[in-house]
């Protein structure tokens, strides 16, 4: 098992890609802390996994909430090896329709939330000899799609935070990597993307949540021990 003995925190893991990541991590031997702003959702996923998972209701933009997540993880499992900053807010809006309140919330969740997670786990990871932080971006962090102004801005920021974080946390043997999903089969997938996959995606189909989760497992594992500051597109060559 690729993650035997490791302890991972996965945010936004009450549904979709995050939930699948939690399941695959557990299958690979990890103990998993599942967080989500929807408490019932993360508790359901944790119950499915069993004794090797706990659930914490958590808004990633809340700094005090991060303290509670880290303290609970250490009290339950004794260490932190992996953080997957999977939680994110997605909403379409044009530049003209983006007000300050909407922009701030988008940045709070998609950038500040990941930043707070990185800050919160840095100490425990350093004390444990290192770790892996995986920030989930978006194809809109590599291209520009009108109508997703605030979301696109936030995901471009995630890429920069990963690169700078890798430089600054590298001396503590903490790796930081960006993973970028393309069209992945989840309840949140826009139906038109699924219907037009053959025309939009060179591989002719959308990706499975399990396919994306397997890449997350690889980056979290010791097989990727010299991978840091890198960016990976998991999108069937949709953007290249």
How would you name each of these model-derived features?
Residues 94-95, 99-107, 197:
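Substrate-binding pocket helix/loop in short-chain dehydrogenase/reductase
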Residues 123, 167-168, 225:
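Alpha-helical segment proximal to the catalytic Tyr-Lys
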